[in-house]
Amino acid sequence: MSTLQAVKYSRGNLEVLDQLRLPHEFHYDNVSTSEEAFDCIRSMRVRGAPAIAIVASLAHAVELHNGSCRATSSEEVISYIHGRLDYLKESRPTAVDLTNAINQLKARTQELAGQDRDAIIKAYIEEAENILEKDLKTNLSIGDHGADWLKDVAQAGPDGKISVLTHCNTGSLATSGHGTALGIIRTLQSRGWLNHAYCTETRPYNQGSRLTAFELVFEKIPSTLITDSMAAALFALQKETMNISAVIVGADRVVRNGDTANKIGTYQLAVLAKHHGIKFIVAAPTTSIDLETMTGEGIHIEERKREELTQISGATVGSDGSVDVAKTVRVATADQRIDVWNPAFDVTPHDLIDAVVTEKGAVVKGTNGEFDFSHVMPERWARLVGQQ
């Protein structure tokens, strides 16, 4: 398993890798308050739905451990905790993992209504730590199920290997470790089933070139970086020779019918994959599945500031090709007067998705063309869907 860590945690202390400095520099920020966590998430120093939920949950655990709560009564303590969680929820509203983690933490503390303040605080901290621990186990299971499913359905080459394309960053840097979509790629590689991995640049924030390419090189996985606009040409010209069999992406939110919100550019890859007969797979923990939202039309899509599209920062490169991480420069990539539309996510319709791979197994559409998640999350399904 990768030794890359987006989050370093021990009780009372949280460090978060500043991913804006990658791939040239490793720097961890101390995050000890909800305000610092909010800024860390909103500024995208940490990103990826699972990692966002983990940072928000643990940041409040750290401030509770360090004595931030002055309330004494049970009711006041619970009110304080829930208020901080409501604040953190607004840091990245599209990511359903954050909402689910907050609901889980609220429910756990509410169970202890009437008990003393220390018991409630202790329960919160333990529940937040459980979210971190469970995420890693979940990712390893997603990797196993995804690799198994692809081995069964993908057309492997003479050597039994396949090539895949991934988008954005869904690896150790987006989770507690191993990753979701990139976790499947890691598992394919470890089993000797991977020929080659392609990753998109993922404009405008370049998570693919800055983060995924970095992880692939770090893991010594055979890989190639392409721009987002090269995917169609890649499929047309190299699908057969490189045996490109799947596009594997993560998800910030999967709704009940399977429509999936993910990093902007995901939808167009699904359309291209369909046209070229390439499997399109969403890798997501069940915590990313939103059973309360029926279709993608109900997903709130975050829009980000215009400068992310018209400007870019990076380390300077010398005439000899050396990178000087001590010197960064911000440059304009467009006329600064141009209007900009900059949605952070798009929604891929479920009919373009071949499988949603969770820690409980791969879910495929039934004969009616619809996804049914009841068998991978029976309790939540019964509670939320069975009542309707």
Curated annotation (Swiss-Prot):
Pfam families: IF-2B. The keyword Ribonucleoprotein does not apply. Belongs to the eIF-2B alpha/beta/delta subunits family. MtnA subfamily. This is Methylthioribose-1-phosphate isomerase. The lineage of its organism: Eukaryota, Fungi, Dikarya, Ascomycota, Pezizomycotina. One of its GO terms (cellular component) is nucleus. It comes from Verticillium alfalfae (strain VaMs.102 / ATCC MYA-4576 / FGSC 10136). GO terms for biological process: L-methionine salvage from methylthioadenosine. Its main location: cytoplasm. The active site is at 252 (proton donor). Keywords: Amino-acid biosynthesis, Cytoplasm, Isomerase, Methionine biosynthesis, Nucleus.
